[in-house]
Amino acid sequence: MRFREGPLGDLKVPLTWTAAVALIVAAVIGVAFLLADRRETLQEQAYGVTRQTVDTVARPVSGAIAAPGRWTGLGLDYVRSYFFTAHENRRLKAELAEMRQWRDRALALQDQNDRFKSLLGLRTDPPIPMAAARVVSDSRGPFANTRLADAGSERGIVVGNPVLNERGLVGRVVGVSRGVSRVLLLTDIASRTPVMIDRTNARAILTGDGGPNPKLDYLRGVDPIQQGDRVVTSGDGGVVPRGLPVGAAVKGLDGRWRVVLFADQASIDYVRILLFKDFAQLADEKQLQARSLPPVTTEDPQTSILSNPVSRPVAPTPSPATATPSAAPAARPATTATPPQTGAPR
């Protein structure tokens, strides 16, 4: 045959012997593994040496045989993790974008909550009722600086009520209707507010001129103000209560004293309106209606001393026509006795 005549014909015997040897070796290895894995009880000592030998030889052989499978598993895990990581990356990016929105919202709510806490922390001495409101409109111009707040007459707000944010005085109410009120800012050209320097109690009028820093007019006293002095409301005239924070004094480029408003340090979005009318509401009504003095009892005008005075008794003066002779004076008693007459006179 051509196969036998060819160069491969000489490989028949080696291939047969190789197959036979491989079969025998496999059988021996199989028997050795069976013996090594056998759970011996009574014959444990008989196969102890064989088991130890098989374990010693099987360890590197098992490692070499298991290496390709292990490498294949690692490769599959890598490919699987690559595609899983790509999918997970896309999912995490979408989640991160969503969480950024929640983060921005949480920061906004935290800022709003802090401002609400600051507004709730506003206290006046003596206490004055307040109404919280949100500024819904901003009207700015070269001459007018006003805001609209979403609280009106239904909440007891009237014209002239002071308006504050969490930092200080903002302005006062100049117009009110149901559900809305107009607030005139301190920077408006029509704004006039009596203030005083907290350090010296020097009085002045805070006058708006349309700029960010209103000026101090009619400042009285000797050296009444210094750079950085705290300016508060004076309460003069009963327009606003005394002691509300306004700002800090600074000297402008024109040489005039001005005020850096505390209210400008925070946005004017949420405000509190003081329901302040006049100083009469600051006093205790019970003290104003204190017990008065007991009433004075008076007599009847007909019998009063003032209307019918009683005359003192006066001795009557006799008239010449009705005059009567006065009685003779009584005889004085004799001091010596007279002898009795016994005979005729001589």
UniProtKB/Swiss-Prot annotation:
Its main location: periplasm. Residues 292-346 are annotated as: Disordered. Involved in formation and maintenance of cell shape. Required for the spatial organization of components of the peptidoglycan-synthesizing holoenzyme in the periplasm and peptidoglycan synthetic activity. The gene is mreC. Disruption phenotype: Affects the localization of MltA, MipA and PBP2. In the case of MltA and MipA no polar localization is observed, and in that of PBP2 the banded localization pattern is lost. Depletion of both MreC and RodA results in defects in stalk growth and mutant cells expand relative to wild-type cells. They appear to arrest in expansion along the long axis of the cell. Pfam families: MreC. It is found in: Periplasm. InterPro entries: Cell/Rod_1 (IPR042177), Cell/Rod_MreC_2 (IPR042175), MreC (IPR007221), MreC_beta-barrel_core (IPR055342). It comes from Caulobacter vibrioides (strain NA1000 / CB15N) (Caulobacter crescentus). Interacts with penicillin-binding proteins (PBP2, PBP1a, PBP1b, PBP2a and PBP2b). Interacts with outer membrane proteins belonging to the TonB-dependent receptor family of transport proteins. Keywords: Cell shape, Coiled coil, Periplasm. NCBIfam families: PRK13922.9-5. This is Cell shape-determining protein MreC. Signal peptide: none annotated. GO terms for cellular component: periplasmic space; plasma membrane. GO terms for biological process: Gram-negative-bacterium-type cell wall biogenesis; regulation of cell shape. Residues 299-308 have a biased composition (Polar residues). The lineage of its organism: Bacteria, Pseudomonadati, Pseudomonadota, Alphaproteobacteria, Caulobacterales. Residues 309-340 have a biased composition (Low complexity). Belongs to the MreC family. Residues 89-118 form a coiled coil.
